[in-house]
Amino acid sequence: MLRRALASRSSEAAIISTRVSLPRGSIPPPPTSSSSSSSSSREGRRPRFFSTTTTSAERPVDDDEWETVVGLELHVQIGAKTKLFSGAERLYGAEANANVAPFDAALPGSLPAVNARAVELAARLGFALGADVQSRSSFDRKHYHYPDLPHGYQITQQRSPIALGGSLDVFVRDGVSGTLRVERLQLEMDTGKSSKAKSSTLVDLNRAGSTLVEIVTAPDLRGAEEASAAAETFQKVVRFLGVGDANMEEGSMRVDVNVSHRTRDGAVAGERCEVKNLNSFRSIARAVAHERTRQIALLKRGQRVRRQTRSFDPATGATAVLRDKEALLDYRFAPEPDLPPVVIEPAALRAIKAAVPELPSTAAARLTNTAGLAPKLAQTIASKPSTVAYFDACAEAADAWSTRNGTVTVDKQDVANWVTGVLVGAVKRAGVTHKGGAGGEPLRGLPESAGAARVGELLARVAASTSMDSGALEATCAAVVASMPEQLAAYRGGRTRAMGSFVGEVMKRTKGRADPRRAAEIIKTLVDQ
């Protein structure tokens, strides 16, 4: 079952500056806790679930008597426009090795420079999870060799991470929910991508150096369903905050699971195994389920579960050994000599914390408890900040209307059904994309008139006020293409990603009023002539 988090919550937070590095001897030793080993010294915490004891079973034990223990390590790409230590763009789907700065390729003489926006977004995620965001953090080198790691080391935050502690409320299904403790959040640079050819290994460094935030959880999860639900909840939070897109199919969110088993009475406990690089929620659930079957079978036969790193094959649903972890790898962690500590000023920390929106789980609980909404309806409304804000505005207007009319009381459940039903349906039919401020004033009268016809009328007014006529859009597109000869040459030379530059410039010149799909169609016609 999920355990109640008792992690401490802090208040200060962030914009960054870099100051003189600490002397090597002054950097504190790495913390001993992880998502799946050792005991926690944090006050109020329960002992770790994983044990180094390997005891053989002296009597047959049914599968139902075994408890699965799972911790997660999530690697999420931060949505900053450029990479963590270089100015190269972070763009999925670009031509191989098109977005590579000298530092990303480890060229001699190139030096890292910290991306302040990436640090700010990581701090935002830390505050949202209730973590203790550190005003001072530092980077380390983690040494290992792989074709897609040109430096021969990864820059990470082993000793002094950006945030410690925190928790996340996880809803699994009706009647099953709880709180998952977070151990730490740390910034690190991503690796490149390697692929096997017939007689060689091909390396694409576009991803190398992208900002990752690694989220390490406590081993509080108890099975495949909870592990998958927790990962999905993290994805929703990352997207909700605008920290990143967390698209698992694109590799911008990858999950490792640490799995071990013990008898429910604690008499028999096995070692943990780590299953790496799971890229879908279904794969997470299947990997944990397979490890349950495999590990329990070993323990019931009185055999050891060896501490291993394993891979998962989605075609077979089975895991396989990548490497044995009985002898721990020596990553030779050392302070990063080319980067001073990251210092987040108190005023900036406070500003970032103040800007963190109410999380979906918190909003759903509030709507259920104070507005009396059904849990499922509350979760639907709480899934987007704009929907929550609009429901709150509608509820406030409904209360004001009730006050003016004396005896009439508007049921908040009716307001919620109207927002999620009539309004959302009318928005989809009208083809209006709401981006925040546009449309707020024209729709202010909606709470007093729940009719679909009235909604359609007002949305049509919004669409008319925020869209461009076809002639003006065509003229703008032509002007943009004419003003960007280098991008035009690149596109005609096969660099199709230049299309994004044209569309972006159109949106900039029209202040967001253009339809980007229509703009792309017009531009394609122009550049293909």
UniProtKB/Swiss-Prot annotation:
Q: Does the keyword Ion transport apply?
A: no
Q: Which UniProt keyword terms apply here?
A: ATP-binding, Chloroplast, Ligase, Mitochondrion, Nucleotide-binding, Plastid, Protein biosynthesis
One family name in Pfam for this protein: GatB_Yqey
BP-aspect Gene Ontology terms = glutaminyl-tRNAGln biosynthesis via transamidation; mitochondrial translation
Task: Report if keyword Hydrolase is assigned.
Answer: no
Report the family membership: Belongs to the GatB/GatE family. GatB subfamily.
Q: Whom does it interact with, and what assembly results?
A: Subunit of the heterotrimeric GatCAB amidotransferase (AdT) complex, composed of A, B and C subunits.
List other remarks: This protein may be expected to contain an N-terminal transit peptide but none has been predicted.
| The protein's name | Glutamyl-tRNA(Gln) amidotransferase subunit B-2, chloroplastic/mitochondrial
Per the UniProt entry, what species is this protein from, by scientific name? Micromonas commoda (strain RCC299 / NOUM17 / CCMP2709) (Picoplanktonic green alga)
